[in-house]
C-alpha cells in the first residue's frame, strides 16, 4: 500500500485505531462481566453472557503483536489482560492455554508462561526459532534459569552507561534489575564498589537481605562485604563493598572516608530527589560530591512510573551529553489490575 511517498504497512492500518473497534470492546466488556460474576460467586444466580471465545483469543493474539509506534505497549498489556481473564474463566480449555502462551511469548512475559504452566515453543519452525532466540536474549546472565521481561532487559543493557535514568511500573522490579547487574559483575570478577541508595532505614534490611541471598557464598569467595552503616567495621578492612544506605548514611560515609572509591551509584526511588521531604538535600549533596571526584562513578537513577525520568540527568548535564539517549520511560507492566467501585 502506498500513501504519498511513504509506504503504508498492513500493521499501520490494523493497529491505527484497533482500541476503538466496537466488536473488540463488546467482547472485552462481556469477558469482564463474566469474570466479575465468577469472582463474586454470582455465576450460579446470574447467567453469563455468551460470546465467541475464538474471536476474543484471536484479538488478543493480534494485540500482542502490535507494532503501533505509540500504542504498542498499551495493546500488548490489553492482550495480556484478555488472556488472563479468559484463563480464569476457561483454564481447562486447551485453546485458551495455546493462545495465552502465544500472547505471553509475544510480549516476552516468561513469568506468565510459568503461571499457566506452559512450555509453548511456537506453531511453526520460524516461530519456534524466534521463540528460542527471544528466550536466549531475555535470559538473565547472573540467573540463567530466569528471564527478564523485555522492558527490564532494555534497562539492564544501559546500566553500564556513564549515566542512565529509567522509570518503570512498580511491578517491573527496578531494584531487581540493579541487583542482577551487580551480581553479574561480581561473578565475572569485578573488583568495584557499588553504592545503592534507598530512601528509608526500613528498606536497608530488605534490600541488603536480597543482595546477600543473591550473592551467597560469593561474598566471601570474591571478597565482598555488604555495608549498611557508615561505621561498619568491614570498611576498615581490605574488601570490595556493596553499600546499601540511606542518603544521610552515605553522605556521612563519603565525608568520613573521602578516599573510598565508588564505581556505581544506584539511586532507587529517585523521585525522592524532587519530592517534599527532608532527605532531598542529601541526595543532591552526594551527587555533587561524586561529580567533583577525579574518577566519577556511573550514575543510575531508578523511579517508579514517572513520565520524565530525564529530569534527574539534568543534575549531571555539565559532565555528560546526549541526555535523551540515557533515558528510558517504560509503561509496560506484566500484571493486570481489575478495579471495582463498590456502592
Regions found by a protein language model. Name each.
Residues 1-343:
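N-terminal helicase ATP-binding lobe
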Amino acid at each position: 500500500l502506498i500513501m504519498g511517498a511513504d509506504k503504508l504497512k498492513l500493521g499501520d492500518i490494523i493497529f491505527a485505531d484497533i482500541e476503538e473497534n466496537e466488536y473488540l470492546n463488546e467482547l472485552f466488556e462481556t469477558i469482564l462481566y463474566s469474570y466479575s460474576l465468577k469472582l463474586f460467586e454470582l455465576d450460579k444466580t446470574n447467567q453469563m453472557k455468551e460470546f465467541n471465545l475464538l474471536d476474543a483469543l484471536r484479538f488478543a493474539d493480534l494485540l500482542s503483536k502490535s507494532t503501533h509506534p505509540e500504542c504498542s505497549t498499551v495493546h500488548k498489556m490489553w492482550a495480556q489482560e484478555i488472556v488472563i481473564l479468559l484463563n480464569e474463566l476457561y483454564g481447562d480449555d486447551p485453546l485458551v492455554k495455546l493462545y495465552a502462551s502465544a500472547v505471553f511469548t509475544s510480549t516476552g512475559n516468561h513469568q506468565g508462561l510459568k503461571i499457566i504452566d506452559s512450555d509453548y515453543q511456537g506453531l511453526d519452525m520460524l516461530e519456534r526459532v524466534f521463540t528460542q532466540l527471544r528466550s536466549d536474549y531475555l535470559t538473565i546472565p547472573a540467573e540463567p534459569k530466569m528471564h527478564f521481561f523485555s522492558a527490564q532487559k532494555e534497562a539492564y543493557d544501559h546500566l553500564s552507561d556513564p549515566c542512565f535514568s529509567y522509570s518503570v511500573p512498580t511491578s517491573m522490579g527496578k531494584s531487581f534489575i540493579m541487583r542482577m547487574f551487580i551480581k553479574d559483575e561480581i561473578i565475572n570478577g569485578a573488583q568495584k564498589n557499588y553504592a545503592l541508595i534507598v530512601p528509608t532505614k526500613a528498606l536497608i534490611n530488605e534490600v541488603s537481605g536480597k543482595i546477600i541471598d543473591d550473592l551467597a557464598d560469593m561474598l566471601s569467595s570474591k571478597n565482598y562485604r555488604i555495608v549498611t552503616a557508615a561505621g561498619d567495621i568491614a570498611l576498615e578492612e581490605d574488601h570490595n563493598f556493596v553499600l546499601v544506605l540511606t542518603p544521610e548514611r552515605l553522605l556521612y560515609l563519603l565525608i568520613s572516608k573521602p578516599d573510598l572509591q565508588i564505581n556505581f551509584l544506584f539511586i532507587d526511588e529517585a523521585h525522592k530527589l524532587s519530592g517534599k521531604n527532608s532527605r532531598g538535600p542529601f541526595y543532591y549533596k552526594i551527587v555533587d560530591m561524586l561529580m567533583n571526584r577525579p574518577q566519577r562513578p556511573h550514575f543510575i537513577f531508578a523511579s517508579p512510573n514517572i513520565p520524565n525520568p530525564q529530569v534527574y540527568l539534568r543534575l549531571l548535564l555539565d559532565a555528560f551529553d546526549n541526555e535523551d539517549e540515557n533515558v528510558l520511560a517504560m509503561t509496560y507492566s506484566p500484571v493486570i489490575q481489575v478495579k471495582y467501585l463498590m456502592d
